[in-house]
Amino acid sequence: MRTDLFDFHLPPENIALRPASPREAARMLVVQGDGVLRDRTIGDLPDWLEPGDQLVVNDTKVIAAQLSGRRISRETEAKIEATLIKRLDGSRWQALVRPAKKLLAGDTIRFGNEGKVCLLGHLDATVEAKGEEGEVTLSFVFHGPALDQAIADLGRPPLPPYIAGKRPADEQDAQDYQTMFAAKEGAVAAPTAGLHFTPALEQRLRARGVGLQRVTLHVGAGTFLPVKVEDTEGHRMHAEWGSLTPETAAALNQAKAEGGRIVAVGTTSMRLLESAALPDGTIAPFEAETSIFITPGYRFRAVDILMTNFHLPRSTLFMLVSAFAGLETMQAAYAHAIESGYRFYSYGDACLLFRQPDERVVEP
């Protein structure tokens, strides 16, 4: 499909720089496909679900992936900003660096600017390799848990570029940019639909008879990238590691068999569920990387309802929601949201989408 079909203009004032407070006060646009767009709030979510439905949340935890440092391996130093984007092994990470032109393979970076130190001393990394678009492979002096602790001590929350370009990350972001379900470290971006949940909302959902299941998908920086090719056929999707346990698969399959609906909280949960689903709709255990790319024409196997934030133009995520609820439906929904002052992106409002009827069998 042509990429420009997924383009739209978003006024800068619609981009949220802070989350709603309290979190349940964020707005929620309900899109059922009947032509009626309903303006609600996150606090209304239990009213749209039925006993036996299963919410599926992503329990990944965002690491402090933004690091400041300096190149120390030459006669003159140079300031370096690095964003960790993918763990390669116990001591190596793939990272995006700025300015990339200041680094060569073999250079050493010492992280810990702005008065920050880690308990084990300074954190050095060697540039093992350098890619064409600013990505580098960093080999750190620490390994495993020691490296994780050093990154936590020295790093900052890796805010998305549309927020970081307007203001620096602060201590409040360390709380705001983490869901209440966060348990397993590895993400460099938050599964943002989960940011809307509070213990009180979870209690109301359980009282309604709605189940809650956890999966893990470590969100990568590629989630923010626009599709740059003119046709979606030419886009190469980024890979992210995910896990869905046998116990969770069994609980979801039992709920489906009893008439319950699968409600994905966020596109990350959606992508993992669809990656784990078999052709007959059975959800299988899963532990691997997925690079599933969902565009209109895809036949959904697992998910019935999707709760998600509002996404970037030309992004793979806007393509995903258009596949789920219909392109024309989502174009109308986004136009309504923009006109009505909904807040977009990571700290913004949400929409609740019901899957469009589609009997076509189209493999991903």
Curated annotation (Swiss-Prot):
One of its GO terms (cellular component) is cytoplasm. GO terms for biological process: queuosine biosynthetic process; tRNA wobble guanine modification. The keyword RNA-binding does not apply. Keywords: Cytoplasm, Queuosine biosynthesis, S-adenosyl-L-methionine, Transferase. InterPro entries: QueA, QueA_dom1, QueA_dom2, QueA_sf. Its EC number is 2.4.99.17. It is an enzyme of class 2 (transferase). Gene3D superfamilies: QueA-like (3.40.1780.10). Pfam families: Queuosine_synth. It catalyses: 7-aminomethyl-7-carbaguanosine(34) in tRNA + S-adenosyl-L-methionine = epoxyqueuosine(34) in tRNA + adenine + L-methionine + 2 H(+). Pathway: tRNA modification; tRNA-queuosine biosynthesis. It is found in: Cytoplasm. GO terms for molecular function: S-adenosylmethionine:tRNA ribosyltransferase-isomerase activity. Transfers and isomerizes the ribose moiety from AdoMet to the 7-aminomethyl group of 7-deazaguanine (preQ1-tRNA) to give epoxyqueuosine (oQ-tRNA). Belongs to the QueA family. Monomer. This is S-adenosylmethionine:tRNA ribosyltransferase-isomerase. It comes from Bradyrhizobium sp. (strain ORS 278).
